[in-house]
Amino acid sequence: MRPPLLLFDIDGTLVNAGGAGRRALEEAMEHHLGDTVRREEAWLAGLKLDGMTDRLIVREAMMGVGHPFDEGLCGRILDTYADFLERQIRGPGYRVLPGVEPLLAELAARRSTVGLCTGNILRGARIKLARGGLDRHFGFAEGDVYGFASDGEARELIVAAALRRASARLGRKVDPREALVIGDTPRDIAAARAVGCPVLAVATGRFDVAALKAEGADFVVPTLEEQHVAALLLG
């Protein structure tokens, strides 16, 4: 039986942004905090960004250079980040990952309930998906199904927010076991597990099949173009 609700991560799962997000965020931090450290020091050096939320990345980066975290400043940095991302995303390194386009098209044709469950801020998510023409498959407005960085720094809060919005849209409480989270990192797996959702992990990010299996994903595939992925998601 196909899952009633499918929640997709973005980076490493649907698209590879070619480093656009990192470049844009470093630009934004330099713009707002350029007098804090020497420019040759990378703002995000040492941070393992895979699966981190945008807000948590900013917090960790600020603390890493000895700058006290400030909620208002974090918001301004992320607004500027989205401005810079509009330009950076046009770089040549961007690509839609294997199997994504036909899978989303088939899910749309079958009227499957899909949503986003990502550490991106809303605007950043839309920019990254729009570059590959994938934004049309997801909703970003009130009443749509999504979880973004604005819902919390911890990814499990984002999964929980997506489930709440799905419940509101469907007019009934969605049990976490009815949803399938699709992601590419151990953080995706841990967040889904914390909320009680099963997980399909795809090895199109930085983690291979063996690593994702070791993290306890319910299903692990090399790419979303695998034939049994369609069978699992489409029933």
What residues fall within each predicted segment?
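Acidic, Mg2+-coordinating phosphoryl-transfer loop and its flanking beta/alpha structural elements
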Residues: V181-F219
